[in-house]
Amino acid sequence: MRGKSRFSLGLVILAGALLFSLIGWGAGLYIEWLWFKTLNYQQVFLTRLTSEIGLRVLVGIIMFLLLLINLMLTRKSVLKAVESAKAFRPFQRDDDNVITINPNPQIDWREQITPGRLTLAFTLLSMALGFLYSSSVAGDWVTILQYFNQSSFNITDPIFNKNLGFYFFSLPFWHIVYRILASAIFLNIVLVALVYLVTDTARGGLAKIFRFPSARYHLSVLAALFFVIKSWGYRLDQYDLLYSSTGVVHGAGYTDIHATLLAYKALMILSLVTAIIIIANIFLNRFRLTAYAIGGLLVTSILLGSVYPAIIQKFVVLPNEFNREIPYIANNIKFSQQAYNLDKIEQKDFPAGRTLQAKDIQENKNTIDNIRLWDWQPLRQTYSQLQEMRLYYEFKNIDIDRYAIDEEYRQIMIAVREMNQDQLPQQAKTWINQRLKYTHGYGIAMSPVNEVSGEGLPHFFLKDIPPVASTNIKINRPEIYYGESDDGYVIVNTKTDEFDYPKGDGNSYSKYEGDSGVKVNSFFRKLLFAFTFADYKLLFTGDITNESQVLFYRNIKERIPKIAPFLSYDADPYPVINNQGEIYWMWDAYTISNMYPYSEPFDDRGNNYIRNSVKVTMNAYNGSVNFYISDAEDPIIKTYAKIFPGMFRPLSEMPEDLKKHIRYPEDMFLVQSRMYSLYHMTDPQVFYNREDKWTLPTEKVGEEEKAMDPYYTITVLPGEKNPEYLLIMPFNPQNKKNMIAWLGARSDGENYGKMVVYEFPKQELVYGPMQIEARIDQDTTISQQLSLWDQRGSSVIRGNLLVIPVEDSLLYVEPLYLQSEQSKMPELRRVIVASGDKIVMEPTLELALQKIYGEGAVLKDRPQQGVPPATDQPAGQQPAPEKTVKELAAEANRLYDDAQAKLKAGDWAGYGQSLNQLKDILTKLQNQSFSQ
């Protein structure tokens, strides 16, 4: 009885655990449904859910039926074995109730088997294995839907003459089908063989199975079916040769076509022959014949699949590799260019020999005014010190964009002030504060890329809380509920007022006016949220009302992939301000594949095709998300549009004030740049010898030499009239430091997406970035000044070196930042400019240009940046004398002690004011130190 009780208790515990898991899964699923519904993407949710569950159910049922049918076919043999086992009972009782001992005693578990129990066991085992096996196709729903909604590429491969859509959409589908069938049949063979062996149907070993007709018939049919499927697998392997990496280039080479392809064809036939032999052996009853057939196939697969191709490669290809591989190299060049859109890059010459004059600087004022002097890394630290305002605010990232500022095309740096609850003091990290009160960030900081104050700090177009604008850019909805930092859930429209922003000695509070959250308007929903978030406090708080909403998945890098996990995304979403003063996030999405024949992969996962097919926008206040198709020619996005009707909109439907801010994405441009460094060579001979291979340049950032990143700038392309927003990457020749070309991607208007490469004359020296860096290090005036700053306890931070095309020449610009040991606020103190053989370092870009080109290079209609602003003094009145370094240091210590006292007292407003005063004193102290 005790054993039965334990068994019953175990069943109860198991059932309880399963029920708990089922409730958790159901609660999470329902919450997901409500979330998708608030975003109007419920159809996307249903399509994904029904596809994934439907696929798993279908595969699970197929596996269940296959297993059950095959196990039931062994039932008769098992029951016979059970009957025969009864003759070997260790104890026997006769009719007179006399017990005798069996001379051959052994306890046999088969005596416990009854027909009913056996059927139940087979059914449960089949169900369990079918359920487990179904999980192997959990991520294949996208491939299945792509197969049934595929689009044409209008391009055929050069070997099998199939449309590329076959390789993108059909071949992966058939691989899944093959994998399911082959593994299912193999599992059935193993399981059935084990049943026959365990029940002693084949007493004496596997070979004895063939003495029993039922076992022989059963296993022979399964084995024959397996080799028929294997034959089909060899057919699929032939198409996979187009992704071979064994030759001189990626894709099918000479050996693949003349050896491996023939081997697969032969093995396909031999697999069918093996299946026929196995079926014939049902009647011949010769186990060795089956063993020889299978063994022969294995040996042949090794000889034909590995040894023969290796011999061809070594003795036929390698002695005359180029001539053998010419057509396949040409295929690789052609299809790699197509896969990365390199065949659409316009090629032009760039003389680069002309020396710029002062009038060239004046005539290209818009280009000069938009040269980026602020790098995002030091600027983020500076923004942090100047504009975070409170310890719980954070600038997660600094982004770059362009705006029409007072009717002038300007490149700007922009950052969103987000809420970081981790920075709250420990005593303030209560459930109310984290879930109900501190719910959102506030506002934006924006500054031009080139303007600097007299203290080496950025000049702000947008700043402070509430937002203060010095230009035509306004913020009317500064609250940030959705962004890059918002990872946790919050509840809005509760009885607790939401903290909006600090105001004087107190705070301003607000109520959420959006409808992007899921309402908690019933105890049932409250229970589901508490269960899903594992947060019991949701059940017992009295602050939640019927109008309360739960906002979750607020981080853009979680929210958007939750809707469209089948897309890939750029590393850097960026904020945009529309004409109504609302803040949006813009994010580039890619369609990526590893199924483009002959194309060279760009990553370790074998991906060899990329398109920036989608632009995604997300409202920072209400979290609404929209997907816009930016590359309507991409067959993959066409397929997704068929799968999810209504999800993707044409780019023409994007509001114009947002469309002005789309830009060519950096991640894709970097991939294309790396590929173009090799695939600009179209001649197979030149390509094979790597005679004209380019490399991406390096630069000196800080004290380290790093790979140069692509960068945005505003300039006028040669032959064009208007300035435009470009993404640029220079190139070096392989193993050289000089510059050979530069690639530009256009981002404005009708020219969006067009790419052009400008090549320099190969007979002329054009300085590359590291050559300019070397000249900076070798310049005695510059190096002495840098050493002097280092000796005074300041860190010198070398910014990104930018190569700026101006007319038919180049301008090299590198900013220098100083950061004291006490302050974490880098200041822009010098600008290095190189042009031709001249290199100078001055406090401002304007002064550097004047030193190179003369007074005529002054940009007259804009005051020089970096010069302390003049102050209006009444006549005859002298300015107050500056405090000494000692006095400033004492004042700094006093303010620090004052700030700490206010922090302990919980006076956040006073704490912030003291920190701002301390910052001003430290700035004055640093300036006096540098001037001495």
Curated annotation (Swiss-Prot):
GO cellular component, one term: extracellular region
Membrane topology note: Multi-pass membrane protein
UniProt keyword Transmembrane, yes or no: yes
Compartmental location: Cell membrane
Keywords: Cell membrane, Membrane, Transmembrane, Transmembrane helix
Segments for region (Disordered): 861-883
Transmembrane segments: 11-31, 53-73, 118-138, 180-200, 209-229, 264-284, 292-312
Pfam families linked to this entry: UPF0182 (PF03699)
HAMAP family found in the cross-reference section: UPF0182 (MF_01600)
Similarity remark: Belongs to the UPF0182 family.
Name of the molecule in the record: UPF0182 protein Dred_1797
